Structure formats: structure tokens, C-alpha cells
């Protein structure tokens, strides 16, 4: 069977990542087993692979290392790094003495994408989010007043807006590059000065000052793990491991 050639000049969406893992498992059946540690909040499988030479003993009887990536939605480089690690070990087994020794005597458990829902939203829309797509702590923020992110000009990006405010503006244009804003110093009176806002719209606008609407995605999966969890920690969720993505990892380990 021909060995898969994966691309590392792009970020894989969920279906592409799934196919890459399936292809690797099919191409190296003696070294790679594909499984799922559970499902995400939206029902996607959270894939993991077990890497070891099965001919030299069961994976569960060897010293092991655990690797995961993409706990936060935007950490797509982490998932691609984990995928590259899998690919590298498999491709170099039997060619590189150290890789061969590792897979003969050790086990690798690799979860490339802990949070497939958040990564998919991050990769396919202009929106930014910290972690999970589950609405929290509010069920619905659409009627709340204030500024909320939106792709106003339809270019596929949500950037920043500079609004002139010579009295209270905290930023000014860089003297080196007019595209860059630099912080205003405390004694700086040589404007113009600006305020920076996320590109977006203001719901129920009644003039300044206006508020910023809470994000619909307030969870931080990294703060949902049992270690050092606290009920008032920002983004920590309802209780330790309340989120399926975190519970999947906790139960697996």
C-alpha cells in the first residue's frame, strides 16, 4: 500500500484531519492504531492514535508518552504538530535507528485535536473564540447591548477599527509605519489619538459610552481541568471536567 503524503503548508479541517489519520493507520497497521477518546459537544469524534511496534509487545506494557494539541480553538498549529509527529515516527521507522528503537520499546498516545468543534469554527469563519463552542455562561447574548464582532466589509476577516478620540484615545499612529498603532505615553499631547475596537456592530447604540457585549463562547477548556479548579475562575465551566472535551482527556489518561 502506498504511504500517504500529508501537507504541512495548510491547516486541516476536521474531515481532512480524520482522513489523514485513517490513511496513516491503514498504511502502517503494524505500528499505528486509530481510536476515539470520546465525542465533542457537537458530536465529533476526538481521534487518537496509538503508536508502537505491536510485534515487540502490547502498547499497554511499555513505557509511554502522551501528546495532545488544539485544546484552545485557535491552537491549530498544535494539531498539525501532533499530526507531523505521528507522520514522522511512522515514516522513519526502520530507517532512523532512534525512531525504530522508540517504537520498538515505547508507546506514543497522540490526540491531535482535543477540541474539534472550536477548531472548525476558527478555521471556517472569521470569528475568534477561546475554546468550546458551547454557549457559556449565557445561553444567548444576541439581545444584549454593546459592541460585538462582525465582518462588516465581508472580506472574511474580523480586524480592528481605529476611532479618533484626541481626549481619551490610548493609541497613536506609528511614525515608522502608518498601519501600526503604538501606545500613547502619559505625557504625550501630540495627536491625533485613537481608540481601538474590534471590527463589529453595536446593538442598541445610544451614543457613547457604549459597552462591549460578552462573547457567546466564554469557556476556557484549559481551566476546566480538575487541577486547581475554582468556581470563580474565568471560563472554568460549571464544575471540573464539565465539558466533554476535557472529560475525554481526563478519562483517557
Name what the model sees in each region.
Residues 1-253:
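M14 metallocarboxypeptidase catalytic domain recognition
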Amino acid at each position: 500500500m502506498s504511504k500517504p503524503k500529508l501537507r504541512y503548508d495548510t491547516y486541516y479541517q476536521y474531515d481532512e484531519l480524520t482522513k489523514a489519520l485513517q490513511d496513516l493507520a491503514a498504511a502502517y497497521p503494524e505500528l499505528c492504531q486509530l481510536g476515539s477518546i470520546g465525542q465533542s459537544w457537537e458530536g465529533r469524534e476526538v481521534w487518537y492514535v496509538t503508536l508502537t511496534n505491536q510485534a515487540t509487545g502490547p502498547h499497554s506494557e511499555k513505557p509511554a508518552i502522551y501528546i495532545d494539541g488544539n485544546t484552545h480553538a485557535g491552537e491549530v498549529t498544535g494539531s498539525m504538530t501532533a499530526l507531523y509527529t505521528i507522520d514522522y515516527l511512522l515514516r522513519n521507522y526502520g530507517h532512523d535507528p532512534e525512531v525504530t528503537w522508540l517504537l520498538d520499546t515505547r508507546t506514543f498516545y497522540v490526540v491531535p485535536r482535543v477540541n474539534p468543534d472550536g477548531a472548525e469554527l476558527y478555521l471556517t469563519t472569521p470569528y475568534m473564540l477561546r475554546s468550546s463552542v458551547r454557549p457559556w455562561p449565557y445561553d444567548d447574548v444576541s439581545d444584549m447591548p454593546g459592541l460585538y464582532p462582525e465582518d462588516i466589509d465581508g472580506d472574511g476577516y474580523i480586524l480592528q477599527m481605529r476611532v479618533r478620540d484626541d481626549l481619551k484615545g490610548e493609541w497613536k499612529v506609528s511614525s515608522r509605519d502608518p498601519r501600526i498603532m503604538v501606545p500613547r505615553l502619559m505625557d504625550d499631547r501630540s495627536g491625533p489619538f485613537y481608540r481601538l475596537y474590534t471590527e463589529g456592530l453595536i446593538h442598541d447604540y445610544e451614543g457613547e459610552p457604549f459597552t462591549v457585549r460578552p462573547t457567546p463562547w466564554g469557556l476556557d477548556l484549559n481551566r476546566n481541568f480538575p487541577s486547581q479548579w475554582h468556581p470563580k475562575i474565568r471560563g472554568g465551566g460549571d464544575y471540573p471536567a464539565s465539558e466533554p472535551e476535557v472529560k475525554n482527556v481526563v478519562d483517557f489518561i
